[in-house]
Amino acid sequence: MGKILLPRITWLLLTCLMLSQSPLLAADATITVTKEQGGREIALKVGNILRIELPGKGGTGYLWLVEETFAPYLKLMSEATQKVGEPRPGSPVMQVWRFKAAQPGACEIKMAFYRPWEGVGKAVDHFGVKLHIE
């Protein structure tokens, strides 16, 4: 009897361990949103990471900047600009933000693409997503 139960218990424990590491069940799962998904509503759970990736052109002065506050629902964890392709003036870049869902509620992230010295009134593009955090 013990020889039969041991493999089953081992299989059950390994299955539980794998499921606990699954990003679908993990509280800190990362949800990535791109420019194409702008305007959508996104559902998050407290602890989830929201990663926003927006394309730009290096050397032009244009940046994606956050327009609307999202506190206390999200916490900004990081913001970075990554080079895409060959490093040349004007070559594509990707601006990437990582936010952590901090508490339940609803908020919206709005961003505008403009040169900071010209102001948001001269924005050439906009991005936004509505968030529902459970």
Question: Which residues does each predicted region cover?
Answer:
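N-terminal edge beta-strand
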Residues: 26-51, 57, 131
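Aromatic sugar-binding surface patches on proteins
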Residues: 89-96
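Short acidic/polar inter-strand loop motif in beta-rich domains
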Residues: 114-121
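Bacterial N-terminal signal peptides
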Residues: 10-21
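Bacterial N-terminal signal peptides that target proteins for export
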Residues: 2-12
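Glycine-centered tight-turn and secondary-structure capping sites
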Residues: 102-107
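Short, solvent-exposed loop/linker segments at beta-strand-coil boundaries, enriched for Pro/Gly
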Residues: 60, 68-85
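C-terminal edge beta-strand
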Residues: 122-132
